Amino acid sequence: MENQKILVAKYAIDHYIKSNMNLGIGTGTTIYYAIKYLSEKIKSGSLKNLKFYTTSSDTKYLLSKEQIPYESNFSKLNKNLDIAIDGADEILLEKKSLIKGMGGAHLMEKVIAYNSETLLIIADETKIVKKLGTKMPIPIEVAQNAVGFIMTRLEEMNLEATLRICKEKKGPTITDNNNYILDVKMHVENPEGTEKYFKLFPGILEIGIFNHKNTRIVYYQDKQIKEA
């Protein structure tokens, strides 16, 4: 799958990213390859005057490692970004709906994505599903003091929710925004309706279902790169 990620990252950048753009940069393993290729194009001079807006501390680290400067102060923005480039955990091609958030950064990923003219998704073939929730749970970022209330609400809806535990240390995963993450097992019949419904719960900061109005998907399938 690593080769597929490299191929789609290079294709997407070659076909969509132009000099003088304001870019949102997502989080995840596929984005790692996008950053590496962006670095090559910047150093060669084929891409110039790009401004980068990041979605996580991990992405900031990767950009710094490639000596790519990024913007830390979002308050300077007074218009939408040109493109947000990101990966996905699951993709429903027919509706261009996504699950994101297994990397724990979906709140800022959605802030960047929904304030960009285009959301450009790059993915290998394992991310394509016929129904959201087939392989992955739905990540929900929750205020720490609200986690008990939210878990009770989800149980009343007969949904199985698990508090995400950090692999590197004892205790729950804490996001860059100092919140917890609940992973909810459910098959999503109506992605747009589900996204809107869960955002009504006090204490839920963001749900990892994405329905951007202008999503472009570059993915690998059947031994070739495809677009949707």
Swiss-Prot record:
Molecular function per GO: ribose-5-phosphate isomerase activity
EC code: 5.3.1.6
Catalytic-site annotation from UniProt: E109 (proton acceptor)
GO process annotations (BP): D-ribose metabolic process; pentose-phosphate shunt, non-oxidative branch
Pfam families: Rib_5-P_isom_A
Keywords attached to this entry: Isomerase
Species this protein is from: Borreliella burgdorferi (strain ZS7)
Binding site for substrate: T27, G28, T29, T30, D86, G87, A88, D89, K100, G101, M102, G103, K127
General function of this protein: Catalyzes the reversible conversion of ribose-5-phosphate to ribulose 5-phosphate.
PANTHER family found in the cross-reference section: RIBOSE-5-PHOSPHATE ISOMERASE (PTHR11934:SF0)
Family, similarity comment: Belongs to the ribose 5-phosphate isomerase family.
Any one cellular-component term (Gene Ontology): cytosol
Pathway noted in the entry: Carbohydrate degradation; pentose phosphate pathway; D-ribose 5-phosphate from D-ribulose 5-phosphate (non-oxidative stage): step 1/1
Catalytic activity line of the entry: aldehydo-D-ribose 5-phosphate = D-ribulose 5-phosphate
Disulfide bonds: none
Enzyme type, top EC level: isomerase
Gene3D superfamilies: 3.30.70.260, 3.40.50.1360
Protein name: Ribose-5-phosphate isomerase A
Subunit structure: Homodimer.
Domain of life: Bacteria
